[in-house]
Amino acid sequence: MSCSGSGADPEAATACAASVAGPAPLVSAPAALPTSTAAESKASPAGTAGGPVAGVATAGTGPVAARAGEPAERRGPASVAAGGAAPPEGAMSNGVYALPSAANGEVKPVVSSTPLVDFLMQLEDYTPTIPDAVTGYYLNRAGFEASDPRIIRLISLAAQKFISDIANDALQHCKMKGTASGSSRSKSKDRKYTLTMEDLTPALSEYGINVKKPHYFT
């Protein structure tokens, strides 16, 4: 194939030489991004397409990136990297998992308040062993003024339970002391126990109350 007028026009001569030489071989694109794409990546803000975050997400780490070249059917379930794992339903604060309701500020009590309401209603018709006047007197001495009689009776019940537990523990110490002394079992059923300070002291020590034996003068 001949080209005419190639000496007059250099551009026409170049085009004619290219057509004579045939189609150019395919050249693989360079690995680096074009200048325009790199400029767009620098100009894009974080979190948008082409920004630094998108570049990190595309690159990937761990087993997901190692199997990126495999076919989709051979990959199987890809493990999620620690950095890209989505948080659970609750919020993560300093590595501590919080329930969704607690994260939203909607904290509800676990125990229902219905039994407590019923118990307070029963206190209106209940007369404790300790009179209300005695409990109210000691509350006033401690600087607590209770106008609701149910509160006074509730404190009276707590005091009764505390004294009852101490008395039962002291009785157990007394029985153990009697068993260790070698008394017969037949007589122990009808035996009457008298609690002394020796029985009361170990029982009180379990509750953090240290009682010293009073001095005996002759």
Curated annotation (Swiss-Prot):
PTM comment, free text: Monomethylated at Lys-189 by SETD7, leading to increased affinity for RNA polymerase II.
GO MF term (any one): RNA polymerase II general transcription initiation factor activity
Pfam families listed in its UniProt record: TAF10 (PF03540)
GO (cellular component) term, any one: transcription preinitiation complex
UniProt keyword list: Acetylation, Methylation, Nucleus, Phosphoprotein, Transcription, Transcription regulation
Post-translational modification Phosphoserine, affected residues: S44
PTM sites of type N6,N6,N6-trimethyllysine: K189
Entry annotated with the keyword Nucleus: yes
Biological process, per Gene Ontology: allantois development; apoptotic process; embryonic placenta development; G1/S transition of mitotic cell cycle; gene expression; hepatocyte differentiation; in utero embryonic development; lateral mesodermal cell differentiation
Modified residues (N-acetylserine): S2
Primary site of residence: nucleus
Modified positions (Phosphothreonine) in chain numbering: T48
Subcellular location: Nucleus
The keyword Cell wall biogenesis/degradation appears for this protein: no
Comp. bias (Low complexity): 27-39, 77-86
UniProt comment concerning the protein's domains: The [KR]-[STA]-K motif is specifically recognized by the SETD7 methyltransferase.
Family of this protein: Belongs to the TAF10 family.
Known function: The TFIID basal transcription factor complex plays a major role in the initiation of RNA polymerase II (Pol II)-dependent transcription. TFIID recognizes and binds promoters with or without a TATA box via its subunit TBP, a TATA-box-binding protein, and promotes assembly of the pre-initiation complex (PIC). The TFIID complex consists of TBP and TBP-associated factors (TAFs), including TAF1, TAF2, TAF3, TAF4, TAF5, TAF6, TAF7, TAF8, TAF9, TAF10, TAF11, TAF12 and TAF13.
Name this protein carries in UniProt: Transcription initiation factor TFIID subunit 10
Gene: Taf10
